[in-house]
Amino acid sequence: MSEPAQPSEPAPALVALRGAAFAYEEGPDVLTGLDFAVREGRALALLGRNGSGKTTLMRLLSGGLKPHTGTLTLGGEPVAYDRKGLTRLRTTVQLVVQDPDDQLFAASVGQDVSFGPLNLGLSDAEVRSRVGEALAALDISGLAERPTHLLSYGQRKRTAIAGAVAMRPRVLILDEPTAGLDPDGQERLLATLDGLRAGGTTVVMATHDVDLALRWSDDAALLTPEGVRTGPTAATLARTDLLRRAGLRLPWGVAATGLLRARGLLADSATGPRTAEELAALAE
């Protein structure tokens, strides 16, 4: 598991919403007055209770929804919601939804992963290169010819992510990617995400798992009724006031850090444990 990146000065915003608001049909605003940025190289965990607007936010960032007011920017430039503008956005930002069956529709794994690159009008050679690269990144090269309906749930998840990776996005947004996976499947997926990050992809993960967020992310964004609060993960997830408003509990690692410091076993300047292995190492 990679170490959280240490911020010096704010990384540039790859994609950002400024003053954005959105409501479904005639309903109340789901999000309003929203300022939110995905910064290059920062692993970002998006957390909040059901109905807090996480899915809406992800779809706004990826161009699936258009804010009623406000602006979506890509590299500092406003996104145009025409074919050219959305193609530019979707080659930079890719969203993978929670249920892989909502994204898989081709007969085989290889065909499904090739769909996006083919739609870009790339040559057959370039499509094959991208598909092979994406399958290898998700460790499913051996499944290229397998019918998608014969895949396990974990394999379907990986295939859906591979389809996004084949677009070579700079930002990959994942909605509950570890949901429904067994512990081994979760570990394998997290290792894959570490590999994508090492290759230069900025990853955003929506999750309800505060312990996973503490372990994996550099920054955490909490959706509360008052808006989105974003900051370095350990400090943000230690804010019991924010956690309460976001409908979340204190991560065990944060609780353990507080206990260790209270007993003089961990210096205030030292980083607290994010995993059971890190806690065990402190005890040695």
Swiss-Prot record:
Pfam families: ABC_tran. It is an enzyme of class 7 (translocase). Its main location: membrane. It is found in: Cell membrane. The keyword Transport applies. The keyword Nucleotide-binding applies. Its EC number is 7.-.-.-. It is a peripheral membrane protein. Residues 15-250 form the ABC transporter domain. ATP binds at G48, R49, N50, G51, S52, G53, K54, T55. One of its GO terms (biological process) is cobalt ion transport. One of its GO terms (molecular function) is ATP binding. GO terms for cellular component: ATP-binding cassette (ABC) transporter complex. Coiled coil: none annotated. Keywords: ATP-binding, Cell membrane, Membrane, Nucleotide-binding, Translocase, Transport. SUPFAM superfamilies: P-loop containing nucleoside triphosphate hydrolases (SSF52540). InterPro entries: AAA+_ATPase (IPR003593), ABC_transporter-like_ATP-bd (IPR003439), ABC_transpr_CbiO/EcfA_su (IPR015856), Co_trans_ATP-bd (IPR005876), ECF_ABC_transporter_ATP-bd (IPR050095), P-loop_NTPase (IPR027417). CDD domains: ABC_cobalt_CbiO_domain1. It comes from the Bacteria. Belongs to the ABC transporter superfamily. Probably part of an ABC transporter complex. Responsible for energy coupling to the transport system. This is Putative ABC transporter ATP-binding protein SCO5958. It comes from Streptomyces coelicolor (strain ATCC BAA-471 / A3(2) / M145). The lineage of its organism: Bacteria, Bacillati, Actinomycetota, Actinomycetes, Kitasatosporales.
